[in-house]
Amino acid sequence: AVALPATLLRQILSSLAGEWVHLSAGGSGMAHITDGTTHFDLAVVPPDDFPKPLHPASPSLQTRLPAGNLAEAIRRVLHAASKEDNRPNIAGVRLIIAPGGATAVATDGARLAIATLPAEEADAQEPYAFTIPSKTASDLATLLDAENTVLLTASQEVAEFEASLRLSTRTLPHPYPAWSDVVQRASENPTRITAPAATILSAVKLAALTAGSEVRTATLNIRSEVRAVTLDIRERNVTLSSETPELGRSTVPLEATVDGPPARVHLNSTYLVQALTACREAVVTIAVGTPNTPVLVQVQDGIYTEVIAPIRTVSQGADT
């Protein structure tokens, strides 16, 4: 057995023109790679220096899941995972395996994304949850694209996903924040608009053109890199707008079904765009409460949900 530098090996294999590649290694400490015309001799890594494969010890869960559905669920929520080094407990995707189904969750504290997938093959006796790092989750989604099912074996320390390839990862050991109550509260928002995700997405992108790259926050009175849009809901009239001194303002009408009292909320346009993009081509309901209440974005079949915290403006801070 030999070990080779992974990045260099990938670069070589992706660049060679031949359909077949011959790889050989002897006792010289070198590995020879050729496609018949181009030749490489690579220094091998001592096998004993290669990390030992991870395996779940005394696994608490072993079940099969539909690989494509799991990959899609991970992709939908991954954008919401925290990218801050000081929040390791949410720097990944939370997977909850339950009898008959599974759920993928990600949050960065300002938004929460949830994707569910039916999985009749799942034979978990009770819900079992663990969190995998974001990079691992991204790699896993790519690996599962060409698979039918994946065998998941997990303990609280290690999760292993096995199909034609096997991926093992350490799980994030830190406690994951409670999130189901956040969704429940947002689902009780009294004002709702319903429209195709693509229609809302187009209006948000258009309104955000005058949002600039900064807004002034009310609580700290400092600048942060946030592009804000305002969602204004009336009885028969829905608009998206933004305004900045350096760019001007925009008002974009949105054709949507309205149910509930008038409402107005300021949202991070990047978050809203990413949430609507994750909804794919589905019909979406956006539920709005007070200006300070998190907003619910949900596809009609409930398979994808995102909750987004609103932005408090300077005028709101002055009024409180």
Annotate the PLM regions.
Residues 1-320:
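Structural preference for solvent-exposed beta-strand-turn elements
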